């Protein structure tokens, strides 16, 4: 049986001839209730929802996501409360894929198998573990499969071809390509042409594997990368939550409008 993630790519890439739009927000920002309202709202336009679990030392996250994480942690967000957010979201959006993204030490402290059991129970479709690279992640990725969860491998511009081939061979339904050597939310320092050139190299290794591009993608840059299988926007959304809070505006409405704009740029 095909996963929800692969079905979304089939619909977006093959039927609608466009990339899938993946949105990233931090679970619990700016509160548990608001976080759920945001993902419920943006799922009107996003094809796949990415939800990050906040961490006090997020090595790959840029300033905007760190601010979001800090707000969520200040509001007392925990892994069990993140599972509650996902459970509530899935009741309303059963067919919408949700990818949980975070750091391995939180999973390790919670207990790997216990974590995966809870992910399956609430309806998590995929996992990205930033600080668990290949081949160290092989055992964990295998366990994910047992619980019908996609483990999403990461590739970067410095990944050698030989290593890339091995990672892609071991990957599940999709691969996440980090477009540039930076934390998330940095300005796009590499031209879209260069990013797509690297993307095409990855696609040639196995054209059947779906490749999404993340880091530095905004309303300004998204349309230039529409040849990709999928595009991830995160920092711009976290920045909008901060702006909405500062201006005392409705972050749910503002994010819905932003994701609608992003979607229209790739249709």
PLM regions and their residue ranges:
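Active-site-adjacent beta->alpha loops and helix N-cap segments on the catalytic face
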Residues: 1-12, 55-67, 74-87, 108-113, ...
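Conserved beta-strand positions in the central sheet of alpha/beta enzyme cores
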Residues: 50, 128, 153, 175-176, ...
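Conserved, mostly hydrophobic/aromatic
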Residues: 23, 42, 49-52, 119, ...
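Alpha/beta catalytic cores of nucleotide-metabolism and tRNA/nucleoside-modifying enzymes
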Residues: 201-209, 220-223, 228, 232-267
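Histidine/lysine/aspartate-rich catalytic loop segments that bind and position anionic ligands
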Residues: 148-186
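Short beta-strand/loop segments at the ligand-binding rim of alpha/beta enzyme cores
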Residues: 14-25, 93-103, 144-154, 202-216
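Glycine-rich beta-to-alpha transition loops that act as phosphate-gripper elements at the mouths
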Residues: 26-31, 101-109, 133-134, 155-159, ...
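Catalytic cores of alpha/beta
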Residues: 31-43, 159-170, 205-206, 213-231
